[in-house]
Amino acid sequence: MKKAKMTAAALAAFFAFAAAPVLDAEFAGTDSVAELNGISAISFSRPAYAQAQEAVDYSTSLQYLPLTTHTQYFVDKDEKGVLLRSHWTAVGVIPFDYQGPKQPVQTMKNALGNYSRHEGKSFEKSRGKLLSDAKKDRRERLANGSTFFGPYQEDGDIFVRRADFRVVSFLEDGYTFLGGAHGLGGVAGRNFDVHTGRELKLTDVVRDKTQLAEAIKQQLMFDYPQSSFAQSGGGSMKGIVDQLIREDKMLWSLDPRGISFYFNPYLLGSYAEGIFTTTIFFSERPELFVKNAASDIIEWRGPQAYCMEIRPYFTMRLSDSPRDEKLFIANDKDRIIIEYCGEKLEDYVNNKEIRPVLINTYDGKKYLYVDYAEVTNNFRLRVYDLNGASPKLVGEYPMTRLASSPQDQANRKWYIMSDPNEFYMRSTKDTNLVPLKRLTCRVGKDGVPEVYEVEGAKG
């Protein structure tokens, strides 16, 4: 499609408001998915924070890789009712204009295409078995005189942590319900070397797994002082971490600023305690990480500016700052809840789902972009500022990362933000100037999204 830049006046008119009603975001011509000896004491007050920061030369020239995810939804039922609800998610590279070497792009197209095809086949196999099990379960319940049957459920989502010309890293977020009191959810990290397309091992990134294990154990004790494992002295947790490291079964993601580790329910604590997660940053433990032989800089460091999807209900460390910079975001039906550096914001807005993205700009400012769904399934964007004493709402804008129609109950496609200076959104119907168009945007002043190209615009 033909593209043209909008004038400053038009852009100002387009986004010169903080909130607006929204109808729906139709899908029009969107590209589909194709296919850690010797560190017995860490100073958690971190008095040398500023000096440690200088140890990492984050890249200012690393090319970003634009991705999209595609979730397919299924409802299996018969004349007696619903048996199984399920969905799975694929991930792929969006075609984009890039004049440099094509090899990294093609390599990741192939790698993510292979990943998605494998996951699709695995999902279909699992779906078939679950459907058979659900039929058997319901039949046995009826035979025993019970008329209640809660449909089985299997969900598979993806949250992209990093996407650039060095690393693509994302979380697989799964949930299964097979009857009983509750289902069971968990995450797993997938980390790809963009130059080779192969999945990275922890030993590709860290120099000494024993040192890494000690760092993880100490950080978990610091991050979760009220947890059941900390209250009992941490012995069981330490044994589990050692075992996971020794057996290469640690779940992790390679983020722009370090490595995050994930411990699913029941592994370190009770089901109610949920998923434990912690991050070891390049800047706080630079000696842990593999360095480039020629430049002596950390091999897998990320770009200076980045965007990162945040899974709701996770508490994430964002830096090794003495400020104890942690972020938690969740939602209830009438509010979006954000906790940052110990301060809490309850933003009262009716919603049924959220999809948050953390943004770190070149000048070090942090913002949250949160796509949220109304009860009608229509999505809109709310922006939050994380740079003051407490999080605050910047505004609401007639755009969304949802690239498909909210009325399509079988498919959902999302644009993935990786570069704060260039990312895709789609305008909504209530935008009279350019409704239902793909927008090329950047993060502007105070976190406000600025549009600088509109798909199909003339003039």
What are these model-derived regions, one by one?
Residues 3-26:
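Sec-dependent N-terminal signal peptides of Gram-positive bacterial secreted proteins and lipoproteins
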Residues 26-29, 33-319, 328-361, 372-381, ...:
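Compositionally biased intrinsically disordered regions enriched in Thr/Gly
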Residues 42, 53-60, 392, 400-409:
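Sequence termini and other peripheral, non-core segments
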Residues 195, 387-389:
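Short loop/turn segments that connect beta-strands within beta-propeller blades
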Residues 324, 365-366, 421:
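Short coil/turn segments that connect the beta-strands within blades of beta-propeller domains
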Residues 351-359, 399-416:
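Repeated scaffold domains used in trafficking and secretory/extracellular systems
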Residues 368-370:
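Gram-negative (and chloroplast) outer-membrane scaffold detector with strong preference
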